Amino acid sequence: MRITLAQVDSRPGELDANVARAEQVIAEAVSTGTDLVVFPELSLSGYTIGDLKEDISIPPDDERMVKLARAANKGAGVLFGFPEAQAHGLHIYNSAAYYEDGQLVHVHRKLFLPNYATFEERKHFLPGQSSRAFPIMGGRHRAATLICNDAWQPQL
């Protein structure tokens, strides 16, 4: 399995610019034969959510997300970090969505939100409720997603 780790410098609050950059990264990765492109936490929004004046959360079926999923529709799966809107913006999660063949397969909502030093995620997000494995590569493999602080938890 070839995995591309997309190291991108996201622009805080600039969804369209970040989506355009992600599209370039996906095209380049797919052209090299990658099987999976993985983007960082909150890569589509930038991490500094608290500094933004407006809510930029989006649902996993947002047209920009679907566009990116289709860009990888040449045999590669893609995982994006984004602020997920639910219930008309009343619930916002720090999420990662996995797409394959242009379709949403799984959304992981960050479970363990830090709230110390410069990390104030609990002020902006609700924690997810569970973590589970999901099929990748046409069901030939299974994977699970952890977002940053989730990986430091011994129970996971």
Segments and roles (model prediction):
Residues 23-33, 64-74:
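A short, N-terminal amphipathic alpha-helix
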Residues 7-13:
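Short polar catalytic/cofactor-binding loops
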Residues 18, 26-56, 79-80, 150:
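Active-site beta-strand/loop signature of hydrolases that rely on acidic residues for catalysis
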Residues 17, 21, 55-63, 91:
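Alpha-helix N-cap and loop-to-helix initiation/capping positions
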Residues 74-86:
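Short, conserved loop-to-beta-strand elements that form functional interface hotspots
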